A protein has these predicted regions:
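Mixed-charge (Asp/Glu-Lys/Arg
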Residues: 1-127, 132-156
Length: 156
C-alpha cells in the first residue's frame, strides 16, 4: 500500500454550503477553488504520477527497459489521450485520485493507495472497488496485523 504526502492542491478544495437534493436533503459538496500556480500544478502532477509508480522503482524500471523516465511513463505507465481507452482511463484515474485525496486529506480517513499501481495495462481500469476509506473512532487504534478480510462478489 502506498503512503501519500499531502499535495499542495488540496488547499484549493473547499466545501460548498447550501447545496440540497430535490427532496431538500442537504448534500456535502466540494469544489476546487484555485488560482493558477505552476508550482502547485507541478506538485499535483507529481502526486498523480506517484499513484502509478513509486519514486524508488521509476528510474530502475526505465533503465531496465532502456528508456528515459519520460518515455517509460508514456509507453508503459500513464494513460495517453491519443491511445484507445486512454482518455477514459485518465479521466477515471484522476477522478478516483481526487476522491481519495478528499477522503484522506480533507475528511481524515485512511485511504489505501494501490489501484493504479501494478495494473494489467495502462489504459485498463481494474474492476472492483474504486476507493476504500476507513477511520478508527478510538485514538491509537490500529488493525491487527494478523487479521485481514477479503470480500469478493461472484456471479451465480
Amino acid at each position: 500500500m502506498l503512503s501519500m504526502d499531502r499535495p499542495q492542491y488540496v488547499n484549493w478544495i473547499v466545501r460548498e454550503d447550501g447545496v440540497v437534493f430535490e427532496d431538500q436533503q442537504p448534500l456535502n459538496c466540494y469544489r476546487l477553488s484555485y488560482v493558477r500556480d505552476d508550482a502547485i500544478l507541478d506538485d499535483w502532477a507529481l502526486h498523480i504520477r506517484k499513484q502509478y509508480v513509486p519514486d524508488g522503482e521509476l528510474e530502475e524500471d526505465a533503465a531496465l527497459n532502456k528508456l528515459t523516465v519520460e518515455e517509460y511513463l508514456r509507453q508503459y505507465i500513464i494513460p495517453q489521450k491519443g491511445e484507445p481507452f486512454g482518455p477514459t482511463a485518465r479521466s477515471n484515474d484522476i477522478s478516483e485520485i481526487l476522491f481519495a485525496d478528499l477522503f484522506e486529506f480533507i475528511l481524515n480517513y485512511e485511504v489505501p493507495r494501490c489501484k493504479q499501481h501494478n495494473r494489467s495495462g495502462k489504459n485498463e481500469s481494474e474492476h472492483g472497488t474504486d476507493i476504500i476509506a476507513y477511520r478508527f473512532f478510538a485514538e491509537g487504534k490500529a488493525p491487527h496485523k494478523k487479521c485481514s478480510y477479503r470480500f469478493k462478489k461472484r456471479r451465480g
